[in-house]
Curated annotation (Swiss-Prot):
GO terms for biological process: hemolysis in another organism; symbiont-mediated cytolysis of host cell. A cholesterol-dependent toxin that causes cytolysis by forming pores in cholesterol-containing host membranes. After binding to target membranes, the protein assembles into a pre-pore complex. A major conformational change leads to insertion in the host membrane and formation of an oligomeric pore complex. Cholesterol is required for binding to host cell membranes, membrane insertion and pore formation; cholesterol binding is mediated by a Thr-Leu pair in the C-terminus. Can be reversibly inactivated by oxidation. It is a multi-pass membrane protein. One of its GO terms (cellular component) is membrane. Residues 1-28 form the signal peptide. The chain crosses the membrane at residues 189-202, 209-218, 287-296, 304-316. The gene is pfo. It comes from Clostridium perfringens (strain 13 / Type A). Mature protein has 3 discontinuous domains; D1, D2, D3 followed by C-terminal D4; the domains rearrange substantially upon membrane insertion. A highly conserved undecapeptide in the D4 domain has residues important for membrane binding and cell lysis, and penetrates into the upper leaflet of cholesterol-rich bilayers in the pre-pore complex. PROSITE patterns: THIOL_CYTOLYSINS. Gene3D superfamilies: 3.30.1040.20, Perfringolysin, Perfringolysin, domain 4, Thiol-activated cytolysin superfamily/Thiol-activated cytolysin, alpha-beta domain. This is Perfringolysin O.
Length: 500
């Protein structure tokens, strides 16, 4: 009887255990199925990462290659050439409006909004993530776990790591200088966005870049971008996409949030913190040497007194905008003295509690394979160069002991509506008239004079060579003063052409 009771008790316990374990096994299987659905769903997404993040800017089919215009004593030839620019940046500039969409560990969609630097955030329940900071000295203290990786909580965790470094290690460790520099002339919004990897609206709003004036050749603008990185914060990459999502999330949930072949999911893998300085060099000069003058000014502190570029610098202004660091001190500086800009760049170059870092750029990866999400920019733009010509004159002087004749001719250039060169031939009304010494005159030339031809001949009195050339020059350059002199005798004539 006792043996029977024991057997019955064991059977009851076994049955209870089976009933208890069944929900656990079922629940565990449900979680596994959800994780597998996310991993297999993201893995099965079909897309070309180069195409899904392609940015096709301006497409230029036709343009006027050349035009000329007279302004006062000047003739300005505007020459346009079609250029193409292709870039594939992996570090994307951060602007204030997207801070809460570009923090370490943030989930995004690789869609058109991402290409335009206004990423779409993928809002779902998340698993904890680890973020790491590369400040020197922290060693094993450089990482922190964020249980619910929202923008606010990740920002708080980063502040905690930075505060720890400031309190314990800033006095014994210095930050290595990591500076990125880029520059470009401005031709269009798409071109400058691709060249500097920054949203053109940022430059338009913060620096006041007048793209219409640039397009109309009323102004020439160069933009400099200085990025000084104080530290970088990275999020651990997942072994599987499902490692990022709460166990309650399914692949269907992700699809409802916008995940598709056209918009695969991304994660912000790292964010660089520091400060960015944008500098605008702007001039109303139409000289073809503007770019060379600006580059010389950037490299050489003494070049501003150079006579070579004096006219350009006198008609230039400079603007600097600082993002990050102690930006209250140098939020925006507008000046005609480039030394003031140098001071802005030099000041506050060291990270401290009084000179904090600012998120300046980020890199994202595709969840499917952790490959870097590079935006592929391709745009056409028109590169415009201006050549300025001034009026000139020909000074004829005849002091020779003989009868002389002159021939002066030139072409005046203009351009039709299609940009084709149109030449109008001009001649001096004193051509081939006998002139005896001493004779002098001035022949004015318009600023659009080209193909200048100057000829002078003397009467020898010889039956077999009645006229002999003293000067015969083609393609004489247009200058302020073209001095043409002839002298001597019929047997020994002399001549010269000088310019000033």
């Amino acid at each position: 009887m006792i043996r029977f009771k024991k057997t019955k008790l064991i059977a009851s316990i076994a049955m209870a255990l089976c009933l208890f374990s069944q929900p656990v096994i079922s629940f565990s299987k449900d979680i596994t199925d959800k994780n597998q659905s996310i991993d297999s769903g993201i893995s099965s997404l079909s897309y070309n990462r180069n195409e899904v993040l392609a940015s096709n800017g301006d497409k230029i089919e036709s343009f006027v290659p050349k035009e000329g215009k007279k302004t006062g004593n000047k003739f300005i030839v505007v020459e346009r050439q079609k250029r193409s620019l292709t870039t594939s940046p992996v570090d994307i500039s951060i602007i204030d409006s997207v801070n809460d969409r570009t923090y370490p560990g943030a989930l995004q969609l690789a869609d058109k909004a991402f290409v335009e630097n206004r990423p779409t955030i993928l809002m779902v329940k998340r698993k904890p993530i680890n973020i790491n900071i590369d400040l020197p000295g922290l060693k094993g203290e450089n990482s922190i776990k964020v249980d619910d990786p929202t923008y606010g909580k990740v920002s708080g965790a980063i502040d905690e790591l930075v505060s720890k470094w400031n309190e314990k290690y800033s006095s014994t460790h210095t930050l290595p200088a990591r500076t990125q520099y880029s520059e470009s002339m401005v031709y269009s919004k798409s071109q400058i966005s691709s060249a500097l990897n920054v949203n053109a609206k940022v430059l338009e709003n913060s620096l006041g870049v007048d793209f219409n004036a640039v397009a109309n050749n009323e102004k020439k603008v160069m933009i400099l971008a200085y990025k000084q990185i104080f530290y970088t914060v990275s999020a651990d990459l997942p072994k599987n996409p499902s490692d990022l999502f709460d166990d309650s999330v399914t692949f269907n949930d992700l699809k409802q949030k916008g995940v598709s072949n056209e918009a695969p999911p991304l994660m912000v893998s790292n964010v660089a913190y520091g400060r960015t300085i944008y500098v605008k060099l702007e001039t109303t000069s139409s000289s073809k040497d503007v770019q060379a003058a600006f580059k010389a000014l950037i490299k050489n502190t003494d070049i501003k007194n150079s006579q070579q570029y004096k006219d350009i610098y006198e008609n230039s202004s400079f603007t600097a905008v600082v993002l990050g660091g102690d930006a209250q001190e140098h939020n925006k500086v507008v000046t005609k003295d480039f030394d003031e800009i140098r001071k802005v760049i030099k000041d506050n170059a060291t990270f401290s509690t009084k000179n904090p870092a600012y998120p300046i750029s980020y890199t994202s990866v595709f969840l499917k394979d952790n490959s870097v999400a590079a935006v592929h920019n391709k745009t056409d733009y028109i590169e415009t160069t201006s050549t300025e010509y001034s009026k000139g004159k020909i000074n004829l002087d005849h002091s020779g002991a003989y009868v002389a004749q002159f021939e002066v001719a030139w072409d005046e250039v203009s351009y039709d509506k299609e940009g084709n060169e149109v030449l109008t031939h001009k001649t001096w009304d004193g051509n081939y008239q006998d002139k005896t010494a001493h004779y002098s005159t001035v022949i004015p030339l318009e600023a659009n004079a080209r193909n200048i031809r100057i000829k002078a001949r003397e009467c020898t009195g010889l039956a077999w060579e009645w006229w002999r050339d003293v000067i015969s020059e083609y393609d004489v350059p247009l200058t302020n003063n073209i001095n043409v002199s002839i002298w001597g005798t019929t047997l020994y004539p002399g001549s010269s052409i000088t310019y000033n």
